């Protein structure tokens, strides 16, 4: 457990609205602290949600509460989801985090907001996905049915990846068919999306299979659901492939695209920009463009800080303890 002095220093950085990029670094330091069971991190993150004026930061704060995966955060997430003054992105992330923690007690509030037709569709869709994830996680016989595969990256996905057998062309086609079928529940399509992601990340996949799966994921940018499209951009960040840069730039520059999707594309480009001067230049342009939506400008500021970290050789992005 961190000393009170060190912890207070990290918390102060998180609450300092003068430097958004530094707030992100402090947040991910607190995430690591919270994942070790120190609940002071949860309280500090919730305090930041109450005090921050940045929808981008607040949505990331809500996301981290879910990734810490401690039921202690549930009352805070319930409050955020119910708060009509919060941005849609923030409430959506609170709903997703309830699914990440996956407590059966969360089903009632998720069902309430899933059925509320007055809410933005992204919130309702997220609630529905989280309901299905919790029910899936608590299904009878889950320990023996072998219905999902172990995650290849250290995150809690909104839906568990569909397991593929051999990472071959048939697997890619089957997953793609589910992934792009807008007549299916988003939960099942998300599962297919993460299954395709895992095929790309699988080191034993051939280059042809890798490319097929990557192209299949990119096809998701044509979907009618902004929530779905934003998850596509997020998954490209997990894949960390320079091949995704052209389609992400197209999304970022599309003024008709939902801000939720454009901001996710910007942050993903921050992780890929070291491989592309075009990507870096685009992020710089948007970060300095006062006519661009604030959430996109802020995303580009954070993305450029991530890019600077990638190019600096620093040991870790979450540097709060080092700076405390």
Model-derived regions: residue spans:
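Structural detector for internal amphipathic alpha-helices that build alpha-solenoid repeat scaffolds
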Residues: 1-2, 21-36, 47, 56-70, ...
């Amino acid at each position: 457990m961190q000393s009170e002095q060190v912890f207070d220093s990290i918390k102060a950085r998180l609450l300092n609205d003068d430097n958004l990029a530094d707030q992100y670094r402090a947040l991910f330091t607190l995430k690591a602290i919270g994942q070790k069971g120190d609940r002071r991190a949860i309280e500090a993150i919730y305090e930041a949600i109450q005090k921050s004026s940045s929808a981008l930061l607040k949505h990331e704060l809500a996301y981290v509460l879910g990734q810490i995966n401690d039921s202690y955060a549930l009352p805070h997430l319930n409050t955020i989801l119910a708060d009509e003054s919060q941005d849609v992105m923030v409430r959506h992330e609170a709903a997703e985090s309830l699914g990440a923690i996956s407590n059966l007690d969360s089903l009632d509030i998720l069902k309430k907001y899933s059925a509320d037709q007055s809410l933005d569709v992204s919130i309702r869709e997220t609630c529905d996905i989280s309901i299905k994830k919790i029910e899936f996680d608590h299904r009878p016989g889950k320990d023996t049915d072998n219905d999902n595969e172990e995650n290849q990256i250290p995150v809690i996905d909104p839906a568990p990846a569909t397991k593929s057998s051999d990472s071959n062309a048939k697997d890619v086609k089957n997953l793609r068919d589910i992934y792009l079928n807008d007549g299916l529940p988003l939960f099942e399509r998300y599962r297919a999306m993460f299954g395709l992601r895992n095929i790309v990340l699988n080191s034993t996949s051939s280059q042809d299979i890798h490319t097929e799966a990557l192209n299949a994921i990119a096809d998701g940018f044509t979907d009618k659901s902004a929530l779905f499209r934003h998850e596509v951009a997020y998954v490209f960040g997990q894949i960390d492939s320079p091949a995704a840069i052209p389609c992400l730039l197209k999304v970022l520059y599309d003024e008709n695209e939902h801000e939720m999707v454009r901001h996710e594309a910007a942050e993903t480009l921050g992780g890929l920009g070291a491989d592309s001067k075009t990507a870096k230049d685009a992020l710089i342009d948007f970060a300095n463009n006062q006519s661009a939506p604030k959430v996109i400008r802020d995303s580009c500021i954070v993305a450029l800080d991530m890019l600077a970290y990638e190019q600096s050789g620093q040991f870790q992005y979450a540097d709060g303890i080092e700076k405390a």
